[in-house]
Amino acid sequence: NGGDAHRLMITGFCWGGRITWLYAAHNPQLKAAVAWYGKLVGEKTLNSPKHPVDIATDLNAPVLGLYGGQDTGIPLDTVETMRHALRAANAKADIVVYPDAGHAFNADYRPSYHAESAKDGWQRMLAWFSQYGGKK
């Protein structure tokens, strides 16, 4: 369909944000990733043997994480745990926390929508993809 496999990028929201982190460690062809408020830590189960914090050393592509400071489902201490893991791994990654935003702050159909954070996050995502996504 005209896609360019040499410019493979991914983004995801909520559970898809978690999968975005994991996919960045899974696919060596990936160029860039942006994870929106994806859970970073958790109990290991048969269905979830690894979490993003477990794969910080294995990232194949630069990842930008976008999180809400008021997200009750993803506590800030878990975001800080991920930041420390990324720094320790010397990973090409960044995490932005929007202090006034909660979970799903980019979902304009939900009460949690936070327009200012959503717009800034979207611009950061586009810039991240432009910087790391490869040239046409």
Residue spans of the language-model regions?
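Short beta-strand immediately N-terminal to the catalytic nucleophile in serine-hydrolase-like folds
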Residues: I10-G12, W36, L66
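Short beta-strand/loop motif that positions the catalytic acidic residue
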Residues: L59, G65-Y67, D71
